[in-house]
């Protein structure tokens, strides 16, 4: 089942990249938290990370705020 947090990250990432069809978000369990793995095309990684990591930080902040209601901790990994 796809969570709201997965949909949120995928939606935003698709808006940022040149190849939205290659954006996937998978969830895997970690120690005390859920890990969301965001996969994008290798040429789009810079767009998802942003200058000095600002976009990645903003994505993680949105993920944290969204997950607060469900009381689940998430970590976001960006993979090319």
Curated annotation (Swiss-Prot):
Going by the UniProt record, its keywords in alphabetical order are:
Cell shape, Cell wall biogenesis/degradation, Chaperone, Cytoplasm, RNA-binding
- Give all residue intervals belonging to the KH domain: 33-80
Asked if the keyword Chaperone belongs to this entry, the reply reads yes
| Any one GO MF annotation of this record | RNA binding
- Cell wall biogenesis/degradation found in the keyword field: yes
> Organism's domain of life?
Bacteria
Disulfide bond entries: none
Q: Which GO terms describe its cellular component?
A: cytoplasm
Alphabetized InterPro entries for the sequence: KH_dom-like_a/b (IPR015946), KH_sf_prok-type (IPR009019), KhpA (IPR020627)
Coarse class of the primary localization is cytoplasm
Subcellular localization(s) per the UniProt record:
Cytoplasm
Which family does the record claim for this protein? Belongs to the KhpA RNA-binding protein family.
Known function: A probable RNA chaperone. Forms a complex with KhpB which binds to cellular RNA and controls its expression. Plays a role in peptidoglycan (PG) homeostasis and cell length regulation.
Q: How does it assemble?
A: Forms a complex with KhpB.
Name by which UniProt lists this protein: RNA-binding protein KhpA
Native species of this protein? Treponema pallidum (strain Nichols)
The gene from which this protein is expressed is khpA
């Amino acid at each position: 089942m796809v969570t709201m947090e997965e949909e949120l990250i995928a939606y935003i990432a698709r808006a940022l990249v040149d190849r939205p069809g290659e954006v996937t978000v998978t969830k895997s369990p970690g120690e005390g938290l859920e890990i969301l793995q965001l996969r994008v095309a290798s040429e789009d990684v810079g767009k998802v990370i942003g200058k000095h990591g600002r976009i990645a930080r903003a994505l993680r902040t949105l993920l944290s705020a969204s997950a607060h209601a469900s009381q689940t901790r998430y970590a976001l990994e960006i993979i090319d």
